[in-house]
Curated annotation (Swiss-Prot):
Protein name (record): Small ribosomal subunit protein uS11
GO cellular component: ribonucleoprotein complex; ribosome
GO molecular function: rRNA binding; structural constituent of ribosome
Function: Located on the platform of the 30S subunit, it bridges several disparate RNA helices of the 16S rRNA. Forms part of the Shine-Dalgarno cleft in the 70S ribosome.
Record's subunit section: Part of the 30S ribosomal subunit. Interacts with proteins S7 and S18. Binds to IF-3.
Database matches in HAMAP family: Ribosomal_uS11
Disulfide-bonded cysteines: none
Database matches in InterPro entries: Ribosomal_uS11, Ribosomal_uS11_bac-type, Ribosomal_uS11_CS, Ribosomal_uS11_sf
Domain of life: Bacteria
Alphabetic keyword roster: Ribonucleoprotein, Ribosomal protein, RNA-binding, rRNA-binding
Similarity annotation: Belongs to the universal ribosomal protein uS11 family.
Biological process, per Gene Ontology: translation
Coiled-coil boundaries: none
Species for this entry: Shewanella amazonensis (strain ATCC BAA-1098 / SB2B)
Gene encoding the protein: rpsK
Length: 130
């Protein structure tokens, strides 16, 4: 029987990205932070729910801060330095997520609000009566 040449396990080389984009989706119930390269390929992501917050604690600014920190630290392996931030949604974690990305050590070059605004499309949810 012929001996199969063993391949040495190759270490996967992470691509180095200098500039990236951070997409923050802040809904009333959760906050999702995705860090991508310039083409939109995801490098890392984190959510408030995945960071250990459940129920109504997911929708707090602190939960959004923790999620942004986790996504930011995970993306540092790619050598990111500058971030362009896109914020979508009306949630309570909008500002705290941006502050957390700044605290991780990224230079934020631009902040853009990309919240979709309907031109009188779908009917909105009814008003809450508490």
């Amino acid at each position: 029987m012929a001996k199969v040449p063993s391949r040495s396990p190759r270490k996967r080389v992470r691509k180095q990205v200098a500039d990236g984009m951070a997409h923050i989706h802040a809904s009333f119930n959760n906050t999702i932070v995705t860090i991508t390269d310039r083409q939109g390929n995801a490098l890392s992501w984190a959510t408030a729910g995945g960071s250990g917050f459940r129920g109504s604690r997911k929708s707090t600014p602190f939960a959004a801060q923790v999620a942004a920190e986790r996504a930011g630290v995970a993306a540092q392996d790619y050598g990111l330095k500058n971030l362009e931030v896109f914020v979508k949604g009306p949630g309570p974690g909008r500002e705290s997520a941006i502050r957390a990305l700044n605290a991780v050590g990224y230079k934020i070059t631009n902040i853009t609000d990309v919240t979709p605004i309907p031109h009188n499309g779908c009917r909105p949810p009814k008003k809450r009566r508490v």
